[in-house]
Amino acid sequence: MFVKTGDKVRVIAGKDKGKEGTITKTVAGKDRVVVEGVNIVKKHQKPSNEYPQGGVIDIEAPIHVSNVQLLDPSTNEPTRVGFKVEDGKKIRVSKKSGNVLG
């Protein structure tokens, strides 16, 4: 997967198109990511120790990784991600600017 937890991304498709956020979780087996503040859904929560009242809560649901694009830190614009091998390590590179991505 070309994105990691902590990356800043922009949603490029779907109901939240244009929103930006940070990736909080990745689901590698299903190629999905959870982006902070994006794809908020209502969940009916049973009473538990964490939620003694229960009720309806808002949570962030995962979206497919193809619907997000990484933001280039130098230009703050969406970019595709390339990979290079330097000193025997695989690193991520911005396709637009050529800069190394964290």
From Swiss-Prot:
Provide a Gene Ontology MF annotation, just one.
structural constituent of ribosome
Entry GO terms, CC:
ribonucleoprotein complex; ribosome
| Domain of life (superkingdom) | Bacteria
Keyword set for this entry?
Ribonucleoprotein, Ribosomal protein, RNA-binding, rRNA-binding
Any one Pfam family here would be ribosomal_L24
Reply yes or no: does the keyword Metal-binding apply.
no
Q: Which CDD domains match?
A: KOW_RPL26
Q: NCBIfam families attached here? A: rplX_bact
Q: How does it assemble?
A: Part of the 50S ribosomal subunit.
The UniProt entry, under HAMAP family, shows: Ribosomal_uL24_B
The free-text function statement in the UniProt record for this protein reads: One of two assembly initiator proteins, it binds directly to the 5'-end of the 23S rRNA, where it nucleates assembly of the 50S subunit.
Q: What is this protein called?
A: Large ribosomal subunit protein uL24
Tell me which species this is from: Leuconostoc mesenteroides subsp. mesenteroides (strain ATCC 8293 / DSM 20343 / BCRC 11652 / CCM 1803 / JCM 6124 / NCDO 523 / NBRC 100496 / NCIMB 8023 / NCTC 12954 / NRRL B-1118 / 37Y)
Q: What is the lineage of its organism?
A: Bacteria, Bacillati, Bacillota, Bacilli, Lactobacillales
Whichever gene encodes this chain, its name is: rplX
